[in-house]
Amino acid sequence: MEVSSEQQLFFMREAVALGERGRIFAPPNPWVGCVIVKNGCIIGRGWHKGIGSPHAEVCAFQDQTSSLVGADVYVTLEPCCHFGRTPPCVDLLIKSKVSSVYIALLDPDPRVCKRGVARLKEAGISVYVGIGHEEAKASLQPYLHQRETGLPWVVMKTAASLDGQTSDRRGISQWISGEQARLDVGRLRAESQAVIVGSRTVCLDNPRLSARMPSGDLYERQPLRVVVDSRGSVPLDARVWNPDSGNVLLATTEQCSKEHIQKLEDRGVEVWKSSPQQVDLKRLLQYLAEKGCLQVLVEGGARLHSAFWREHLVNAGVIYWGPKFLGDQGSPMLRDLQLCLDNAEHVKITKTFLVGDSVKTCFECVGREDG
């Protein structure tokens, strides 16, 4: 049966949507989705549910009840061709005698890149690459970025008043955004493998940094909570050190006392030391990537956000605009960047919509105006 380009895109978008279901549990693997189509109808759906579990293609094959001979397979990422925790997906595709495989994106992993396509073509299967490319790229951007750069995809998150203040003149920020916005942050944290916060924010707000569902229950998988504290100024009774909400890492320097470090290590906190005077943020990100982090959420405050901006380490951002005005005596989102219009940081706004009584703006970083 002839399938139009519009139908092909429809099927791939369905695969992308399926892949998103695995976004929380799949990392450090990519959240891949797959649909199987025969005679113009979807007969199988699948997505990768977590490390060590069957890949999307296998799940889709297990979901169908018809013969796969002559079927078309739509998958958001190039099928693997190597043995890992699971067998190669290309072997299953070849054995099942499918007619065609539509792939949205090639896998940048050197163990797979173009090799999966080559294996399928050698077996006489028609392969088409690029259908739904933009949709799949938008979904899998953290995975693609981490594989290509060795750094996790860094998302800056902040809440601000309509005039751009992240706290009032007393330094208080709870709460600028509304309740629905705060619930939305729970999902954003769950989709990240690490959440980074600065010492001043911990001292002022005493956050748990846990990822909670709208019901108030913790997500089954919690992000690593990372506290950037060069001198060990965060008190030992801060809620962030509580192991009940997941693992914690202290990113610090030689300025932090051995006694403070030992007390935290005794509680199960991992300690990562950087350069003598201040935490090397790029090295920290490299370390988090080595631990399997694909996406990192930087929650601030302004000093930490500004440090990431100065080093051009921010890839995207989410701003929750609360329905308030605070004047100019609070804390701005960013400090001391020394930028003018002709060398300003340029971003592409990708989404803006209401979340309860707050406005959520999503953006991706493009670069500086001066190139």
Swiss-Prot record:
Residue ranges of the region described as Deaminase: 1-150
Cofactor: binding details: Binds 1 zinc ion.
Record-listed NADP(+) binding positions: A159, W175, T201, D205, S230, G301, A302, R303, L304, H305, S306, A307
Pfam families: dCMP_cyt_deam_1, RibD_C
Active site feature: E57
Cofactor entry: Zn(2+)
SUPFAM superfamilies: Cytidine deaminase-like, Dihydrofolate reductase-like
Reaction catalysed by this enzyme: 2,5-diamino-6-hydroxy-4-(5-phosphoribosylamino)-pyrimidine + H2O + H(+) = 5-amino-6-(5-phospho-D-ribosylamino)uracil + NH4(+); 5-amino-6-(5-phospho-D-ribitylamino)uracil + NADP(+) = 5-amino-6-(5-phospho-D-ribosylamino)uracil + NADPH + H(+)
Xref: CDD domains: Riboflavin_deaminase-reductase (cd01284)
Alphabetic keyword roster: Hydrolase, Metal-binding, Multifunctional enzyme, NADP, Oxidoreductase, Riboflavin biosynthesis, Zinc
Residues that bind substrate: S173, R189, L209, R212, E299
Disulfide-bond pairs as recorded: none
Domain CMP/dCMP-type deaminase stretches: 6-128
NCBIfam families: eubact_ribD, ribD_Cterm
Protein name per Swiss-Prot or TrEMBL: Riboflavin biosynthesis protein RibD
Organism, scientific name: Chlamydia muridarum (strain MoPn / Nigg)
